[in-house]
From Swiss-Prot:
An essential GTPase which binds GTP, GDP and possibly (p)ppGpp with moderate affinity, with high nucleotide exchange rates and a fairly low GTP hydrolysis rate. Plays a role in control of the cell cycle, stress response, ribosome biogenesis and in those bacteria that undergo differentiation, in morphogenesis control. It is an enzyme of class 3 (hydrolase). Belongs to the TRAFAC class OBG-HflX-like GTPase superfamily. OBG GTPase family. The lineage of its organism: Bacteria, Pseudomonadati, Pseudomonadota, Alphaproteobacteria, Hyphomicrobiales. It comes from Sinorhizobium medicae (strain WSM419) (Ensifer medicae). Keywords: Cytoplasm, GTP-binding, Hydrolase, Magnesium, Metal-binding, Nucleotide-binding. Monomer. Its EC number is 3.6.5.-. This is GTPase Obg. GTP binds at residues 166-173, 191-195, 212-215, 279-282, 308-310. Its cofactor is Mg(2+). Signal peptide: none annotated. PROSITE patterns: G_OBG, GTP1_OBG, OBG. One of its GO terms (cellular component) is cytoplasm. HAMAP family: GTPase_Obg.
Amino acid sequence: MKFLDETKVYIRSGDGGAGAVSFRREKFIEFGGPDGGDGGRGGDVWVEAVNGLNTLIDFRYQQHFKAKTGTHGMGRNRTGAKGADVTLKVPVGTQIFEEDSETLIVDMVAEGQRYRLAAGGNGGFGNAHFKSSTNQAPNWANPGLEGEEKTIWLRLKLIADAGLVGLPNAGKSTFLAACTRARPKIANYPFTTLHPNLGVATVDEKEFIIADIPGLIEGAHEGVGIGDRFLGHVERTRVLLHLVSAQEEDVAKAYKTVKHELEAYGGGLEEKPQIVALSQIDVLDEAELKAKSKALGKACGTPPLLISAVTNKGMTETLRALRSVIDAAKAGEEDA
C-alpha cells in the first residue's frame, strides 16, 4: 500500500430545498388557502476517525466531496426531505486544517470521533408561512439557502506508543519486524524505509504500538533527506527508542547527530523519554562491543541497551523497558 500523509480536498455541503407555492384544492372549498411546505435542509459534510486506516491514500483518487441538496417542499404542507450527508473517513490521528494549512479545525484523536466540517443550507419557507391578515393567498416562497464550500487540508500524524529513531541503516525496520508482525522493506542500504511503518509488539501479554520512520541524517530538520517529513509521526508517541548501529565507526557522533536533529525539529521531541540502544551487536566481537558500548554510554549519559534483532539478544529487555515508560506515561495522563 502506498503511503500518503497530507492531501488537499474540496468539500461542499448541500443547498437547502426550495419552499413550495401551493394552494389547498378540495371539493366544496372554494378558497382553500396556501399549503406550500418548506424545503428540506441540505446534507452536511462530516469527518470521522476510523480504525484500520493508516494512510490518506484514498484521497489521492477522490478530492471533491459534495453533499446532496435538500428536497423541495410540496403541497399539503409537506416538508422536503433532508439531503444526504457525506462522511470523510480518515485514520485516527488525522488533523484537519483550513486552506492556509496552518489554522487547525479539528484533531481526530479517537476512534469514532465525528466532526461536522460544513453544515447544509436551510430549506426555504413555503408560501403557507407568508399567509397574513392582509394577504390570504401569497404566491411566493423562499429558495433554499446555499451550502458551505471550502478547501481543507488533511494531515496525518500516526498515533503510536513508541517511536523508533536513528540514522539510516540503524536496524529500525529489522527491529520492528523482529518484535511485531509488521513486514517493512529491509535491505542493506540507506533509506530502504521510505514511509512510516506501524507494528504491534507484545511483551508479558501486554500490547503496544511501535512506529518506524525513515532514518534521519544531518540537516534533516532543514529538509535534507526524507526523515524530517515524517518526524511528525513520532510527536504523539510516549517514548522514543533511539537505535545506534554497532556498524558505525563513531557511535557517539551517530547518537549526537540524531539528538541534534530532534532538538532542532522541535515539537517536544527533545523532551520525550528516550531509551538508547546499540543495535546489530552480532557483527562485533567482545572487545569491540565493550568499546563501542562505553563510547555510546558516555555520549548519552547512561549505559545503552545492547540488542540484536537477528539473534534476539536483548529484545525482550528492550520491549520491557519501553513498556515500563509507556505505562508510567499513561498513569500520569490518567492522574492529570
